[in-house]
Curated annotation (Swiss-Prot):
The keyword Nucleotide-binding applies. Signal peptide: none annotated. Heterotrimer of A, B and C subunits. Belongs to the GatC family. It comes from Mycobacterium leprae (strain TN). It is an enzyme of class 6 (ligase). This is Glutamyl-tRNA(Gln) amidotransferase subunit C. The lineage of its organism: Bacteria, Bacillati, Actinomycetota, Actinomycetes, Mycobacteriales. Disulfide bonds: none annotated. GO terms for biological process: glutaminyl-tRNAGln biosynthesis via transamidation; regulation of translational fidelity; translation. Its EC number is 6.3.5.-. It comes from the Bacteria. Keywords: ATP-binding, Ligase, Nucleotide-binding, Protein biosynthesis. The keyword Membrane does not apply. GO terms for molecular function: asparaginyl-tRNA synthase (glutamine-hydrolyzing) activity; ATP binding; glutaminyl-tRNA synthase (glutamine-hydrolyzing) activity.
Amino acid sequence: MSPISRDEVLHLARLTRLVLTDTELASFSSQLDVILAHVSQIQAVDVTGVEPTDNPLKYVNITRPDETVPCLTQQQALAEAPEAIYGRFVVPQILGDNK
């Protein structure tokens, strides 16, 4: 694989709307060369017969089951509120105008 040129890095920077210095262009060029070399090695691996997966672990639905549990009634929840109107908590306004 041929090394990534400064012009190619500059083109990618323009596509992503990044403004890079000359030092960054040189640095990214060498970094992209290393990254693409690793990708090339990975692409060379023979995966014939290997089942595609998004997770190497075989755990399936290991979360606990949902269970209904008793909860507060509306009246119980509002009983200790400093202020409630129409079955809802009253809180200070934090957004918009104070109209």
